[in-house]
């Protein structure tokens, strides 16, 4: 089934009967297919390749020296850091190794030491998202600090900030993309804030040490090699492109998809499939998006190795259609149009911007 713009739903009374567990049958089919088996050759190639390419990039940066041509290096590093972050995402989901400890340390090295993002902060936030995607009051990914993605957020912020921001919120879909230029800086700041906070953090000493080495060492290298003016622009370009790339990779996954009221309960299959959107494309897109374009498959089987997601998508799509579960997929550019249109309509105060198939799904549960 091709993707249609779908979003906010009206709260419905929770049914007392227990929802069916259609996921069990799918899990058996996927397990029998061997798609949950680890791909060590694939991941060791990517892990070693990431370290080699990063080392080459740093060496090239030093050799090129103090010149405005380094802005191209900044762009290349932004792309490389995003790809490494996506690899860390795989490790955090136990896709790379069977050993939880190996996955944890891989995530710490890739995330904290190489990219400058706290593994513990991301894991805490992302685990809650996976448990209840797009569920109001449960999913931290729909509680954005600037952009409103639910009508209640619009009402709350309008009362707090007054009518001055009315026009901005009405056009927030357009501002969403420029705001992503600040996302890279926000990710680093959130990571540092979590490490310095009193909230529980399993590897606080390691995370703090790795973050200090990465952020401090990176800034020192940039300002040693480059003059202050070029260094400042270099950092702005690198952080800006990093934030945009990260944002454009994650935004199509759930933005503009159904919002689940806090009172509504769904079985696992529908909770993951109905709130997720796949992005059609070739293998180049698979690499560019780090496998996030198979969001439905990833949410159903988070530990499935990335190279197996494409093969699993056809199997899971057929299963969903056979069980009457709406499976959404669309093109990349169309997904951005859907996201923009939805965020704008929420900003204008529309309570139910699109016809949502979740109501029909609820009737069948």
Language-model features, listed with the residues they occupy:
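Conserved catalytic cores of large enzyme domains
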Residues: 5, 256, 338-346, 350-365
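Single, functionally critical "micro-switch" positions that shape active/binding sites
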Residues: 88, 213, 252-253, 297
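Short, compositionally biased low-complexity segments
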Residues: 1-8, 22-26, 146-153, 311-314
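C-terminal, active-site-flanking charged/polar segments
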Residues: 238-251, 255-256, 316-322, 326
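Short, charged cytosolic
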Residues: 2-29, 175-186
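Membrane-embedded catalytic scaffold of the fatty acid hydroxylase/desaturase
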Residues: 76-200, 261-352
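Alpha-helical bilayer-embedded segments of polytopic membrane proteins, i.e.
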Residues: 40-84, 111-116, 170-185, 200-250
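Low-complexity, highly charged intrinsically disordered N-terminal segments
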Residues: 14-50, 54
């Amino acid at each position: 089934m091709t993707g249609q713009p779908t979003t906010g739903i009206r709260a419905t009374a929770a049914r007392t009967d227990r929802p069916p567990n259609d996921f069990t049958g799918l899990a058996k089919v996927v397990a029998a297919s061997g798609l949950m088996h680890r791909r060590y050759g694939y991941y060791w190639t990517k892990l070693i390749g990431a370290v080699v390419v990063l080392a080459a990039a740093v060496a090239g940066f030093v050799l090129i020296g103090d010149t405005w041509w380094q802005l191209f290096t900044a762009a290349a590093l932004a792309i490389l850091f995003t790809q490494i972050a996506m690899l860390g995402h795989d490790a955090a989901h136990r896709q790379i190794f069977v050993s939880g400890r190996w996955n944890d340390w891989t995530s710490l090295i890739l995330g904290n030491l190489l990219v400058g993002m706290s593994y513990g902060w991301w894991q805490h936030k992302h685990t809650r998202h996976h448990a209840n995607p797009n569920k109001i009051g449960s999913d931290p990914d729909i509680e954005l600090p600037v952009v409103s993605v639910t009508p209640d957020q619009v009402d709350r912020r309008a009362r707090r900030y007054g009518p001055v921001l009315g026009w901005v919120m009405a056009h927030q879909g357009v501002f969403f993309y420029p705001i992503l230029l600040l996302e890279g800086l926000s990710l680093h700041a959130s990571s540092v804030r979590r490490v310095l906070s009193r909230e529980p953090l399993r590897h606080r000493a390691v995370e703090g040490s790795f973050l200090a080495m990465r952020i401090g060492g990176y800034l020192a290298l940039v300002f040693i090699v480059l003059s202050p003016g070029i260094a400042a622009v270099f950092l702005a370009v690198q952080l800006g492109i990093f934030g945009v790339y990260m944002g454009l990779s994650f935004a199509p996954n759930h933005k503009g998809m159904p919002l689940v009221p806090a009172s509504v309960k769904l079985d696992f299959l529908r909770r993951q499939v109905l709130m997720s959107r796949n992005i059609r494309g070739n293998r180049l897109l698979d690499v560019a998006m780090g496998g996030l374009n198979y969001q439905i498959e990833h949410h159903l089987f988070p530990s499935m190795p990335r190279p197996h997601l494409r093969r699993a998508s056809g199997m899971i799509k057929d299963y969903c259609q056979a069980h009457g579960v709406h499976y959404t997929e669309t093109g990349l550019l169309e997904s951005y149009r859907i996201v923009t249109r939805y965020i704008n309509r929420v900003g204008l105060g529309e309570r139910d911007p699109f016809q949502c198939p979740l109501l029909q799904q609820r009737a069948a549960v």
